[in-house]
């Protein structure tokens, strides 16, 4: 399985810290980047994804979750730009770290959708992982990352990750 995201070498400004203000909510970028998929294993029914900043550990003490999504149809080939908000019919989305006490948001459009990179201290590498699954997962909107991992057990046919850079 392969995933492709345009980055040269950084994620485009529109999806990260330097997004135009019209693409920000509570100061954070909300337009999700397009993701292309190919070589999805036969037998895959859905895809799930995580977009996590492990470089945040020295800053806040834990890996920062920017986006989680599940039940993406395995046949789609691409999750289009801004799908997190404009194509919610393609997925169910989980809670990100902007709901934590460090960020303190309670706006569902911030905490239950893509909320892009805003590295505070240096360039960060963000890990996008996509999972091919043999089932639709039993999750509710706003699920937690641990619930996603628990539901995926026994259903992962393939997984792949890429690192995407965002500039300070």
UniProtKB/Swiss-Prot annotation:
This is Uncharacterized protein YxkA. PANTHER family: PEBP (PHOSPHATIDYLETHANOLAMINE-BINDING PROTEIN) FAMILY PROTEIN, UNCHARACTERIZED PROTEIN YBCL-RELATED. It holds the Pfam family PBP. It comes from Bacillus subtilis (strain 168). Transmembrane segments: none annotated.
């Amino acid at each position: 399985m392969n995933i492709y995201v345009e980055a040269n070498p950084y994620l485009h400004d529109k999806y990260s810290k330097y997004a135009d203000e019209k693409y920000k909510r509570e100061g954070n970028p909300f337009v999700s980047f397009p993701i292309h998929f190919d070589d999805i294993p036969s037998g895959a029914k859905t895809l799930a994804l995580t977009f996590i900043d492990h470089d945040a550990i020295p800053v806040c003490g834990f890996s920062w979750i920017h986006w989680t999504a599940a039940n993406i149809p395995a046949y789609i080939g691409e999750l289009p730009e801004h799908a997190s908000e404009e194509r919610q019919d393609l997925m169910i989305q989980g809670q990100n770290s902007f709901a934590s006490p460090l960020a303190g948001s309670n706006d569902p459009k911030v905490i239950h959708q893509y909320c892009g990179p805003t590295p505070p201290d240096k360039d960060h590498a963000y890990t996008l992982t996509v999972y091919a699954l043999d089932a639709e997962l039993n999750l509710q909107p706003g699920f937690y990352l641990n619930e996603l991992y628990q539901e995926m057990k026994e259903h992962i046919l393939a997984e792949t990750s890429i690192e995407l850079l965002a500039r300070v």
